[in-house]
Amino acid sequence: MATSAMHHPPIVVLAGATASGKSALAMAIAKKIGAEIISADSRQIYWELTIGAAKPSPKELQEVPHHFINEKHIGEPFTAGDFAVEAWQRITAIHQRDKRVVVAGGSTLYVEGLLKGFANLPSANEAIRQRLETELQTLGSEALYQRLVKLDPTQAATLDATKTQRLIRSLEIIESSGTSVTALKAAQQPPPSHFTFLPFALFLPRETLYQRINQRVDDMMANGLLHEAEALYQTYCDTWQERNLSALRTVGYQELFAYFEGRHSLDEAINLIKQHTRNYAKRQITFFSNHLALRWIEQAEMEEIVEQHGF
């Protein structure tokens, strides 16, 4: 018989920077405690992104059930709010099967939505988005940013003119809903009250993390990232709108797209992937440190906890 809703064991959440070892540790924990894994990675959900998204191997997917891997195609909208709602539903279903849950991933808004809830924002409006993207091309990002400053100064303060996808999404929400993003966020939907989270973030010394990032990029290139990026470029980059699909605005692909267009040499593109990935890791660490109450823990300490207590 399934355990009652009020007596489920806690949900282990393992966040942290890219290349910090979250996925491997999540696998070890899941095998130890008999858990299924929820991937909190906004790129692994797409079928078309494999090497550059650092997906688990087919063998790992066979050994432990994973969720939110290969479930969407590029171009299908899937927001952090969508993830939170579906993740809560799947956690409930996993609990009903008397299984444990491990959440692993570094997508900051996915982890935040899962743990804290999310604002009930309107779904993507393709017509509005395409018009805003055209305005971005013709007017520039600063003009759109100043529009957001007038319409929702609080939301504008959380980003800048370089964050074009968040900028367009903010303006799209305002036009779709007729109200500010800030007002919608104030009516945030919390996670189910009977969920208990054990939220951790995996810590690595910066130099070690950066070495791992550089090595991961080299490994991705050796494993066929160039071929994967070329296939994506030939399939999806005919128009400006396709090129700027959220899924394709991913470190590792954008730099190689620039190489295909002759804007960088291959060596320059690889070095840029490493640099941009290090920058991304730094932003992840800053976000997780400032916005979420996570317990920062080294891998050896986490392994010891699992071995001794099993959560």
Curated annotation (Swiss-Prot):
GO terms for biological process: tRNA modification. Its cofactor is Mg(2+). One of its GO terms (molecular function) is tRNA dimethylallyltransferase activity. Pfam families: IPPT (PF01715). It catalyses: adenosine(37) in tRNA + dimethylallyl diphosphate = N(6)-dimethylallyladenosine(37) in tRNA + diphosphate. The record marks 107, 129 as: Interaction with substrate tRNA. Residues 41-44, 165-169 are annotated as: Interaction with substrate tRNA. It comes from the Bacteria. The keyword Magnesium applies. ATP binds at residues 16-23. Keywords: ATP-binding, Magnesium, Nucleotide-binding, Transferase, tRNA processing. Its EC number is 2.5.1.75. Substrate binds at residues 18-23. InterPro entries: Dimethylallyltransferase, IPT, P-loop_NTPase. It is an enzyme of class 2 (transferase). Catalyzes the transfer of a dimethylallyl group onto the adenine at position 37 in tRNAs that read codons beginning with uridine, leading to the formation of N6-(dimethylallyl)adenosine (i(6)A). Monomer. Belongs to the IPP transferase family. NCBIfam families: miaA (TIGR00174). This is tRNA dimethylallyltransferase. It comes from Chlorobium chlorochromatii (strain CaD3). The lineage of its organism: Bacteria, Pseudomonadati, Chlorobiota, Chlorobiia, Chlorobiales. The gene is miaA.
